[in-house]
Amino acid sequence: AEFGPSQPFKGAK
């Protein structure tokens, strides 16, 4: 999970 609730800064935007 590159982008998820745990890593919203990984590419959630």
UniProtKB/Swiss-Prot annotation:
Record-stated family: Belongs to the adenosylhomocysteinase family.
Cofactor: NAD(+)
EC number: 3.13.2.1
Name of the featured protein: Adenosylhomocysteinase 2
A Gene Ontology biological process term: one-carbon metabolic process
Subunit architecture: Homotetramer.
Organism superkingdom: Eukaryota
Cofactor note text: Binds 1 NAD(+) per subunit.
Job description of the protein: Adenosylhomocysteine is a competitive inhibitor of S-adenosyl-L-methionine-dependent methyl transferase reactions; therefore adenosylhomocysteinase may play a key role in the control of methylations via regulation of the intracellular concentration of adenosylhomocysteine.
Organism from which the protein derives: Populus euphratica
UniProt enzyme class: hydrolase
Molecular function in Gene Ontology: adenosylhomocysteinase activity
The entry's keywords: Hydrolase, NAD, One-carbon metabolism
Entry keyword annotation includes NAD: yes
Annotated metabolic or biological route of this protein: Amino-acid biosynthesis; L-homocysteine biosynthesis; L-homocysteine from S-adenosyl-L-homocysteine: step 1/1
Catalytic activity from the UniProt record: S-adenosyl-L-homocysteine + H2O = L-homocysteine + adenosine
